């Protein structure tokens, strides 16, 4: 059996931005337990820069697609080749699908080294983050009875990445260039992947859509309550048309609103969230980022999604979080029934809580 100092934990997780933020405590727990940064198998072009700010995470290997047939996907071949050269060590698979296990087994990873979600369901009321931490406390069969890999029950890792001075400086320079450096900042996140996934964003299947007119009314209310504030519409470049439609719906004071959908790579967004007064968002990764970075958050949530506040407020955190649901108890109800006045009231409550 390898000596304790030679073991490097390997984690497999193919998650969206928010999912990967909520994985950070697991990475920290495993790195502390085994004494080395984790290796990570994942996906997403933003995963590598995010994990560069997590000292508990070492090398990251990315798949372009895990669902594609193996013989048609070079990144899967390369992963399997790498696994075949990989020394034995603990492997934690925070994925429910069979493809992850198939790739591991094809790469020669023996089952005795693997801890996974197979037979390890979430407990009632358990958040994704705490589910991952519980998996991190499991011990691979290959290490049963071994000394040196005990779980530290006093260690309670948070989900916060460690931003550098360069990250903060980049954000401050961007704010100065936009004329935003001296104003309170309220961040708005109207879009997510589901909203922007082709077709008409008002389609009935898009339950995460909150109408442009609602956003415009919200912005008007925010301006009335905090006249000095500058409002920044966040998102990806694909979400710019939605942001432009929202601004076009404003009756006045459009100069106080900045569309930043082309200007916010992951690390700048996280740095911005450490500086902002607050954020209002639909259910999407940047909302996780706000709670993680200590930015007070109002998030609009459909009822079929996870209800645990811990999902949006990774512990420990200094961020007050208000989660708003549709008025209807129908699990398929969309967000449109949440009135702008309700969101404004929740936002004002944040200011009191903060």
Write out the residue ranges for each language-model feature.
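Catalytic machinery of carbohydrate-active enzymes
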Residues: 1-354
């Amino acid at each position: 059996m390898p000596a304790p100092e030679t073991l490097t934990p390997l984690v497999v997780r193919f998650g969206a931005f928010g999912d990967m933020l909520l994985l950070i405590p697991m990475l920290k727990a495993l790195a502390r337990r085994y004494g080395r940064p984790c290796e990570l198998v994942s996906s997403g072009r933003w995963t590598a820069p995010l994990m560069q700010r997590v000292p508990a995470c070492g090398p990251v290997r990315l798949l372009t697609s895990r669902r594609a047939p193996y013989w048609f996907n070079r990144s899967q071949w390369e992963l399997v080749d790498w696994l075949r050269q990989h020394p034995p060590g603990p492997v934690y698979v925070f994925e429910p699908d069979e493809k992850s296990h198939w790739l591991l087994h094809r790469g020669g990873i023996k089952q005795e080294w693997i801890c996974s979600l197979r037979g390890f369901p979430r407990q009632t009321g358990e958040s994704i983050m705490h589910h991952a931490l519980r998996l991190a406390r499991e011990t691979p069969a290959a290490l049963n009875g071994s000394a040196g890999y005990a779980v530290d029950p006093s260690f309670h890792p948070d989900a916060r990445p460690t931003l550098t001075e360069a990250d903060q400086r980049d954000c401050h320079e961007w704010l100065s260039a936009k004329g935003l450096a001296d104003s309170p900042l309220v961040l708005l996140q109207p879009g997510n992947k589901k909203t922007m996934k082709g077709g008409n964003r008002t389609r009935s299947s898009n339950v995460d859509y909150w109408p442009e007119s609602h956003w415009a009314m919200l912005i008007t209310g925010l301006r009335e309550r905090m006249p000095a504030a500058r409002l920044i519409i966040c998102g990806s470049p694909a979400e710019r048309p939605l942001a432009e439609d929202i601004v076009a719906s404003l009756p006045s004071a459009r100069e106080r609103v900045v569309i930043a959908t082309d200007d916010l790579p992951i690390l700048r967004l996280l740095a911005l969230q450490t500086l902002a007064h607050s954020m209002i968002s639909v259910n999407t990764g940047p909302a996780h980022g706000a709670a993680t970075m200590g930015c007070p958050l109002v998030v609009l949530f459909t009822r079929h999604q996870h209800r645990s506040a811990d999902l949006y407020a990774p512990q420990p955190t200094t961020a007050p979080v208000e989660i708003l649901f549709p008025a209807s108890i129908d699990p398929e109800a969309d967000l449109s029934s949440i009135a702008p006045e309700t969101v404004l009231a929740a936002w004002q409550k944040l200011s009191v809580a903060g």
